[in-house]
Amino acid sequence: MYSEIQRERADIGGLMARPEYREWNPELIKPKKLLNPVKASRSHQELHRELLMNHRRGLGVDSKPELQRVLEHRRRNQLIKKKKEELEAKRLQCPFEQELLRRQQRLNQLEKPPEKEEDHAPEFIKVRENLRRIATLTSEEREL
């Protein structure tokens, strides 16, 4: 069966038209052999050589240089380590500490709006309040 297929292909090859290079006709342009790009440029040769070496070693075309892989691996490990530390810091806080932080934040929020209102108040009102405080302090000192 295989030999029959080979015979058929050989017969087809004989039927195909071949250019007649033997006949010399001055009007015809002789075909030139195409240049192999691998042999044509030095950079292409080096690229081809590198690809062959990578193929022999079993490396893919998409693989990165070793230094770049190591740097990415370190960055990834640092990010993972940082995230783990943050999660552990949150877990290690006891409920008492968490409640203290919440109360501290609430107190800070409650203290901030009056300061803002005082900043927007006219100066004569601020001076008047300062005078009242001083007056109350001096009266308390007199009582003592």
From Swiss-Prot:
Residues 66-112 form a coiled coil. It is found in: Nucleus; Cytoplasm, Cytoskeleton, Stress fiber; Cell junction, Focal adhesion; Cell projection, Ruffle membrane. Its main location: nucleus. A motif (Nuclear localization signal) lies at residues 74-84. Stress-inducible actin-binding protein that plays a role in synaptic and cognitive functions by modulating actin filamentous (F-actin) dynamics. Mediates polymerization of globular actin to F-actin. Also binds to, stabilizes and bundles F-actin. Involved in synaptic function by regulating neurite outgrowth in an actin-dependent manner and for the acquisition of hippocampus-dependent cognitive function, such as learning and long-term memory. The keyword Transmembrane helix does not apply. Belongs to the FAM107 family. The keyword Glycoprotein does not apply. It comes from Homo sapiens. InterPro entries: FAM107 (IPR009533). GO terms for cellular component: actin cytoskeleton; cytoplasm; focal adhesion; neuron projection; nuclear speck; nucleus; ruffle membrane; stress fiber. Keywords: Actin-binding, Cell cycle, Cell junction, Cell membrane, Cell projection, Coiled coil, Cytoplasm, Cytoskeleton, Growth regulation, Membrane, Nucleus, Stress response, Synapse. Interacts with ACTB. Interacts with COMMD1; this interaction stabilizes COMMD1 in the nucleus. Interacts with MAP1A. Interacts with PRDX1. Interacts with F-actin. This is Actin-associated protein FAM107A. Residues 112-124 have a biased composition (Basic and acidic residues). Residues 105-124 are annotated as: Disordered. One of its GO terms (molecular function) is actin binding. One of its GO terms (biological process) is regulation of microtubule cytoskeleton organization. It holds the Pfam family DUF1151. Widely expressed. Expressed in neurons. Expressed in malignant glial tumors. Expression is reduced or absent in a number of cancer cell lines.
